[in-house]
Design a protein with these regions (language model features):
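Class I SAM-dependent methyltransferase SAM/SAH-binding core
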Residues: 89-158
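Core SAM-dependent methyltransferase catalytic element
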Residues: 261-285
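A short SAM/SAH-binding and catalytic strip from SAM-dependent methyltransferases
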Residues: 167-181, 204
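Conserved alpha-helix/loop element of class I SAM-dependent methyltransferases that forms part
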Residues: 53, 63-89, 104, 108
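A short acidic, Gly/Pro-enriched loop at the edge of an enzyme's catalytic core
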Residues: 156-169
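A short glycine-rich, Lys/Arg-flanked "PGG" loop and its adjoining helix->strand segment in the class I
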Residues: 182-197
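N-terminal auxiliary segments of SAM/dcSAM-dependent transferases
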Residues: 14-45
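C-terminal alpha-helical "lid/dimerization" subdomain adjacent to the S-adenosyl-L-methionine
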Residues: 204-260
Length: 285
């Protein structure tokens, strides 16, 4: 009996160790469990597939409201070199999409504060998404301007960005696709100057059960179908819907931002449209 108990105990320890190893070596891709080293390329494949229809995709996934959410984020940050200042800001927009946030921040600074000196680094891991942003830039006041640069970078590392170099770090609808979200937050903290602001806009968890039921019905029933009809790409839209459900809830994500070293004011987030999306803010002290 003693020997049997010892064998059971040993087996339990082995299973526990194996479970930890499994947890360490694997991650989620939507609802699928995959090796961590495969996720980056799978996510790249999704966004290469949807790059040319990226704005349409966000319209479908948010019923068009993402444009209002982005406008609200930009106005909430209210960034720009003030007329009595000689220090332009250095922005970093990660997982840039087609540049909504990047161009919006520069527009806000220019139109509200007359700021024509602040600079913007636009970063994305996916070269197809970067090309979409570059094409869109050609129709903005920042076309061929030295004030804006596009970089192909992994948001979890940002190897080309020096420590303590950026004033504002923004990321919209991108961080949930990271393999290691905490590593991405740690990197955001690294590249920001003391006093710098981290701002994240991301799909989140609806806080009303009845509304959540309706939202999930819309998400899982209609979104993949519309992806098939609009972009001939059901699988990418299915992944994007599932990735929202796998993303941490508002409180958990706020605590992850704190864990990266940021001061998080108040409860740490602002729900938008009943929690369909949320804005998270952190300050590097």
């Amino acid at each position: 009996l003693t020997r049997a108990t010892g064998l059971i105990s040993s087996a339990a320890r082995h299973l526990s160790t194996s479970a930890v190893a499994l947890q360490q070596d694997f991650t989620h891709f939507g609802y699928k469990t995959i090796p961590k080293d495969e996720k980056e390329n799978l996510v790249k494949g999704v966004f290469s597939s949807v790059a040319s229809n990226y704005d349409v995709m966000n319209d479908v996934m948010s019923m068009g409201i993402h444009r209002l959410w982005k406008k609200h984020l930009i106005e909430k940050l209210d960034c720009g070199m003030r007329p009595n200042s000689n220090e332009p800001l250095d922005f970093l927009d990660v997982a840039c999409g087609t540049g909504d946030i990047a161009f919006g921040l520069l527009d806000h600074a220019r139109l509200k504060y007359g700021d024509n000196k602040s600079t913007m680094t636009v970063a994305d891991i996916n070269p197809d998404m970067l090309r979409e942003g570059e094409k869109r830039c050609l129709s903005t006041p920042y076309a061929n301007s030295p004030r804006i640069q596009f970089l192909e970078q992994n948001g979890e590392k940002m190897d080309a960005i020096p420590d303590n170099s950026k004033d504002v770090y923004t990321i919209a609808f991108g961080i949930r696709n990271f393999t290691n979200i905490q590593a991405g937050l740690n990197t955001a903290y690294r590249v920001l100057k003391p006093g710098g602001i981290f701002a994240c806009l991301e799909f989140s968890q609806v806080n009303d059960p009845a509304l959540d039921y309706l939202y999930q019905a819309y998400s899982f029933s209609l979104l993949p179908l519309m992806g098939q009809l609009i972009a001939n790409d059901r699988d990418s839209y299915q992944y994007l819907v599932e990735s929202i459900r796998k993303f941490p809830n508002q409180e958990t994500f706020a605590n992850m931002i704190r864990e990266a070293g940021f001061y998080v004011p108040g409860k740490g987030y602002e729900n938008l449209t009943f929690g369909v999306a949320a804005i998270h803010i952190g300050v590097k002290l």
